[in-house]
């Protein structure tokens, strides 16, 4: 997976400080960065940074992403964490604890097709 543009645009120390501040201020929320996968045919998302309730499921978060990119109902969308497709019933806090980045953010990418084909 290519380096995310969010990581490219912001130095590690700044990202770490921001994630720590967010987690301290909102302990029941997960800081998530969502970016479109490379070569994906779905629209780009209007904002990349999300503060997600810890008890939200991956499926519920996929719904949020679909709404933000205004994806039509007949089009598929896949959300990946480190090139892996997490189960839709998984709780975001569990995904965060297992896959958070060294900077404290959870990075997710989305695509209109299952480009990686790997499931948890």
Curated annotation (Swiss-Prot):
Gene3D superfamilies: Phosphatidylinositol 3-kinase Catalytic Subunit, Chain A, domain 1 (3.10.20.90). The record marks 117-118 as: Cleavage. GO terms for cellular component: autophagosome membrane; cytoplasmic vesicle; microtubule. It is found in: Cytoplasmic vesicle, Autophagosome membrane; Vacuole membrane; Cytoplasm, Cytoskeleton. This is Autophagy-related protein 8d. Constitutively expressed. Signal peptide: none annotated. The lineage of its organism: Eukaryota, Viridiplantae, Streptophyta, Embryophyta, Tracheophyta. GO terms for biological process: autophagy; protein transport. Ubiquitin-like modifier involved in autophagosomes formation. May mediate the delivery of the autophagosomes to the vacuole via the microtubule cytoskeleton. Interacts with ATG4B. Interacts with NBR1. Keywords: Autophagy, Cytoplasm, Cytoplasmic vesicle, Cytoskeleton, Lipoprotein, Membrane, Microtubule, Protein transport, Transport, Ubl conjugation pathway, Vacuole. A lipid is attached at residue 117 (Phosphatidylethanolamine amidated glycine). It is a lipid-anchor. Pfam families: ATG8 (PF02991). The C-terminal 3 residues are removed by ATG4 to expose Gly-117 at the C-terminus. This Gly-117 forms then a thioester bond with the 'Cys-558' of ATG7 (E1-like activating enzyme) before being transferred to the 'Cys-258' of ATG3 (the specific E2 conjugating enzyme), in order to be finally amidated with phosphatidylethanolamine. This lipid modification anchors ATG8 to autophagosomes. Belongs to the ATG8 family. Coiled coil: none annotated. It comes from Arabidopsis thaliana (Mouse-ear cress).
